[in-house]
Amino acid sequence: MENALSSQNLGFMPYLVAGSQILGIANLAITGAWLAQLQRRFLWSGPLQFNVHPLCMVLGMVFLCGEALLVYRVFRHETKRSTKILHGVLHIMALVISLVGVIAVFQYHQANGYPDMYSLHSWCGIVTFTLYILQWIIGFSLFFIPGVAFTYRSQFKPLHEFFGRALFLSSIATSLLGLTEKMFSEYSSHPAEGILVNSLGVLLVVFGAVIAYILTREDWRRPPLPEEQALSMDFKTLTEGDSPTDQ
């Protein structure tokens, strides 16, 4: 992603973007190593089915969600349509992969007679995932489907941005709750695994902090291209019936 920033005078933003990519890959590598080696790999059935859940949630709700949030900061010369499509595709990938993780843990609980939805992790997780689905549906309806009034899009955009960031941070917090729940009774008997999981938790927090900082910098926001400004005003005139010169 950082190559798209090379021609921009954006201070140290390219280094933060590069750092976020390294952190994201490190999170996935540590999660995979933990589950594949110390938790004895992955299976879709039996006692190892649970291992599918944390990998899918870290990949989907944390890494891919974070990548989707960075699209409008990183790709500054590509058309708005291209960046919008990439943003939406990354979110739908995150949604599908996370859905696999949710199904895996429910099936694992059912097969082993464990109760569902009893822990704080599960409550936060299902609320975050449900809101993520609603966020995607509403965002798709307003920003991808042609003909939606300019006023509705402009009014909802701040809420869309806020909930996107809030759900990303909520996903990281829920992941930390899940890691603690998984390892709570095993720290004393598996110290090496405990260190690895704690390291993963710290890296998840740093990954979230770096992306959150990039998103808070308004001066790093993607500027509209000249042709996009003209199209935006034409679209507003078409859907609202007013003239740009009247504003």
From Swiss-Prot:
> Where does it localize?
Cytoplasmic vesicle, Secretory vesicle, Chromaffin granule membrane
Task: Check the record and name the SMART domains matching this protein.
Answer: B561
The entry lists its GO molecular-function terms as: metal ion binding; oxidoreductase activity; transmembrane monodehydroascorbate reductase activity
Which reaction equations make up its catalytic activity? monodehydro-L-ascorbate radical(out) + L-ascorbate(in) = monodehydro-L-ascorbate radical(in) + L-ascorbate(out)
Provide the residue positions that the database annotates as binding L-ascorbate.
K80, K84, R153
Write out the residues that bind heme b 2. R73, K80, H87, H160, R221
The alphabetized list of GO BP terms reads: ascorbate homeostasis
**Vesicular topological domain residue ranges:** 31-51, 106-124, 180-194
Top EC class per UniProt? translocase
Instruction: State what this protein does.
Output: Transmembrane reductase that uses ascorbate as an electron donor in the cytoplasm and transfers electrons across membranes to reduce monodehydro-L-ascorbate radical in the lumen of secretory vesicles. It is therefore involved the regeneration and homeostasis within secretory vesicles of ascorbate which in turn provides reducing equivalents needed to support the activity of intravesicular enzymes.
Q: What is this protein called?
A: Transmembrane ascorbate-dependent reductase CYB561
Per the UniProt record, the source organism is: Xenopus laevis
Name the gene behind this protein: cyb561
